[in-house]
Structures are given as C-alpha cells and as structure tokens.
Amino acid sequence: MRILGIDPGLRLTGFGLIEQTGQKLAYVASGVVKSGEGSLPARLGILFGGINEVIATYRPDTCAVEIVFVNVNPQSTLLLGQARGAAICAAVSNDLTVAEYTALQIKQAVVGHGKAAKTQVQEMVKRLLALPIAPTADAADALACAITHAHGSRLGAQSTAGYRLKGGRLV
C-alpha cells in the first residue's frame, strides 16, 4: 500500500510517500509544495494544485494528514487550517481516504514520546526508511505522518476508531 503523508503549512506544505509491504516500509518520495507570495486564495490554489500533482505522479492508495494545533495567534491557526483544508480537498477529490493524526500521536509512533524535537523526528524517519540523509523538517513530518498511518499504532488506531467513511473522508 502506498501512503501519502501531508504536513500542512501555508508557506510550505510537506509531503512524503512510503510504500508498505507487510511490515516493511520503503521510501518513495518527499518534498514540499511552496505557495509563494500573493493573495490567500491564490496560495491555497497553489497548495491544492501541488498536492494534486503529487497524487497524480505517485498514485497513493491512502492519505494521512497532521491535525492542526491551536496556535497562540488565532489568525495563524485559521490560515494553517485553510492550508490543511486545501490539502485534504486535493486528497478527497482524488478519491483517497484521509486519516488524521495529531503531532503528539505522530511523535509517539515514530520517536517513542510525544514531546520529541523536530530533529529527533528527522533522525528517526531517516533510520526507519534507511535514508542516506535526514529529510527536511517539513518532508520529515509528512513522512512521519505516513509512517504513523502505516504502523497503525495504538494511538493512530484510536484516531479512526468509531469513525465511518463518507465521501472519502473519515467522519
């Protein structure tokens, strides 16, 4: 199964794809979609188009997206939520199911504790996928999200327990 992980952001949205065969995970691709400058609708359109392009290129079977945390600045949280929405819409418009995980769940599944630093996540992603170098922070977070989904860890499994599929999305 090919899993697309997404770390949403308005300026940079990280993506990471892994292939799961039984217990084995293999790296497929990772990177970022840059929205650049301009109006909010234009930037969201770039993110939507970029994720669509990733999906068309790599043909994932499912998608895992990091849940937005509530920031100190409410405006930043709203903007991040809109970027996340654009990414989810791209996945759903391509008939992918979307699982959602908190940063705590992702760090717990990949590093072993929920308060891990970004560098720890990068290093564990590098090790788990046998990469020669650690991916960038945004790509590593996206790959970690995909790894969390692949592991179906106890924390990850709880995030979808009791939900049903509606329009390609867990509700």
Swiss-Prot record:
CDD domains: RuvC. Binds 2 Mg(2+) ion per subunit. It catalyses: Endonucleolytic cleavage at a junction such as a reciprocal single-stranded crossover between two homologous DNA duplexes (Holliday junction). Its cofactor is Mg(2+). Mg(2+) 1 binds at D7, D138. The keyword Magnesium applies. GO terms for biological process: DNA recombination; DNA repair. Keywords: Cytoplasm, DNA damage, DNA recombination, DNA repair, DNA-binding, Endonuclease, Hydrolase, Magnesium, Metal-binding, Nuclease. It comes from the Bacteria. Homodimer which binds Holliday junction (HJ) DNA. The HJ becomes 2-fold symmetrical on binding to RuvC with unstacked arms; it has a different conformation from HJ DNA in complex with RuvA. In the full resolvosome a probable DNA-RuvA(4)-RuvB(12)-RuvC(2) complex forms which resolves the HJ. The RuvA-RuvB-RuvC complex processes Holliday junction (HJ) DNA during genetic recombination and DNA repair. Endonuclease that resolves HJ intermediates. Cleaves cruciform DNA by making single-stranded nicks across the HJ at symmetrical positions within the homologous arms, yielding a 5'-phosphate and a 3'-hydroxyl group; requires a central core of homology in the junction. The consensus cleavage sequence is 5'-(A/T)TT(C/G)-3'. Cleavage occurs on the 3'-side of the TT dinucleotide at the point of strand exchange. This is Crossover junction endodeoxyribonuclease RuvC. It comes from Thiobacillus denitrificans (strain ATCC 25259 / T1).
